[in-house]
């Protein structure tokens, strides 16, 4: 420690040189100068960097990376030229191997620190994170905001971190390669036909967002333009409703792109940050595209809930099904089931499966997916898990051999956890998108009589800080016991020898 810096007060715009010794939960580099902590976006553990303080507090500060003086062995050149400005990827400067280690450590440390579990116990049951062979071009869905730059030029791209400022870009490296051609086609059409971009501040302008989806197994592509449309549509000569000026030109250009299967319009006139409205009109070919996940075929509409990384989702769900240990006779409850992907996948190995989801559209999709795949042993309920589960258990006496839960980031509701403990399933499979709330819920379940058996992270979103985790818990029966063989002769001899020596 440098005595000359003892008691120094750090302030905004100070330039400092620091070694990065840790990684924060949001992927930021962490360094310390005389006990004063600096959080630096885009810095990598092992870097020596020059930074400028942007926001100073008493014991810590947020700083901007000015220069990498000595790069870490884990630092790489990002594929994306706007990686620093864009808010989508936080870890592109870090090697993929180090990203996986960061996520493994993040899950482990949260369970130990926030859940109060013994580190050695967690280390003994943690399995290696499930990574991707190729961590790019994995997203089958992307939503691109449309706006204008300071010169009035129409742009599309991605929001900068913690803002709604659009960073222009059409070639996202974690999205499908078709995104670029589709977006450039739409921008060119808008410029030629003087179609306005939406302005969030004024609420004026027509085109708000572009949604692009692709079925990885089918190769089918969907484009949906979200527009601020307040008038009445008119019919073209072909009978198609028109919502855009010279709409036929746009359809002609987009339909020429290989794989194009569905073009639609979504109406959203609300002054809101919510991207999609509820009114969707198909203007070319099909309303949906198809994809396959876990051996099941799904029809996907613009509003459908569907995993954005089907490659990793299959691995994650396969692990969850393996943990469930199904033999063909079990009754399974799947809470927060979405469109029923896990529910339907487990139905093939269970006696009866029940899915619960609060969003009606998702349950409609789940029921349709069950019919489409010829599944007859699955039932779905609309409602809050913490309300539906107690009702079915207390009023109808429905039980569970296995309960699978995949809650939102806030974790599982305490009422649902309490009912799960009362139902006392043999196994609980917990799929989590937030290891902090996972740790909290695991503590409740373990205090209620369950034991952690396995923990396995899964990298669903490479280049970002997000990590999924699947956990297996088993019921500890009151009569569980440990068999210990004791050699009484040996014990007696040891007691005698101890008494003689004294």
Regions found by a protein language model. Give the residues of each.
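Short, solvent-exposed loop/turn elements at beta->coil junctions and helix N-caps
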Residues: 127-134, 200-201, 207-209, 213, ...
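Short beta-strand elements
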Residues: 21, 137-149, 153-160, 212-216, ...
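Rossmann-like S-adenosyl-L-methionine
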Residues: 2-17, 25, 231-502
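Internal alpha/beta scaffold segment
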Residues: 166-208, 229-264
